[in-house]
Amino acid sequence: MKKYLFIFYIGLIALLSGCGSEAECPLNSVSLARFNFMDSKTHAGVKLTNGATVTGITISDGKAEVDTVFNKAESYMSVPLSYTDQTTYVIHYTETMRDTIELTHKNRPFVSDIECPAMMFFEVENIRYTTNALDSVKLINPEITNEEKVNFHIYYRVASAE
């Protein structure tokens, strides 16, 4: 009988030690939309000019809040979305030349584990944009999560070197 009791306790200890309370939370809990800048003819990546700045406009309680969300000369940008159902970005090329990109999206709160912080995922439903300097914007992946993946291509008409 002592032998069975000993085996029972060993099994119980093994079972309970396998139930850890430490959750494996994702290292990145922020969902960012990734836009790649592309040549509309060749589909090659192009860099945004040095002076370009991208601002995000959020309407909250009837007030517009404007924040700079990107200001680097890169071939892509990763920017946050608003927790409202609409996000607007303005790309300022010069003092007077700019384009506006407006996203309409569903917000989906997500919790991977009770011990992990809540995250917000987004599903893009519609996109509108101006074409002052950019040619077009293509939706590549409507699901915006904490995973790093391309969601949009912004196409520009690039002057040829000929």
Model-derived features with residue positions:
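A short, Gly/Thr-enriched small/hydrophobic beta-strand-prone motif that recurs across taxa
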Residues: 26-38
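Positively charged n-region of N-terminal signal peptides that target proteins for export
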Residues: 1-4
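C-terminal motif of bacterial Sec signal peptides marking the signal peptidase cleavage site
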Residues: 15-18
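Extended low-complexity, serine/threonine- and proline-enriched intrinsically disordered segments
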Residues: 46-62
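Short beta-strand segments within Ig-like beta-sandwich modules, predominantly Fibronectin type-III
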Residues: 66-72
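Sec-dependent N-terminal signal peptides
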Residues: 6-10
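Extracytoplasmic cysteine-anchoring/structural motifs
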Residues: 20-25, 75-162
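Structural motif
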Residues: 36-46
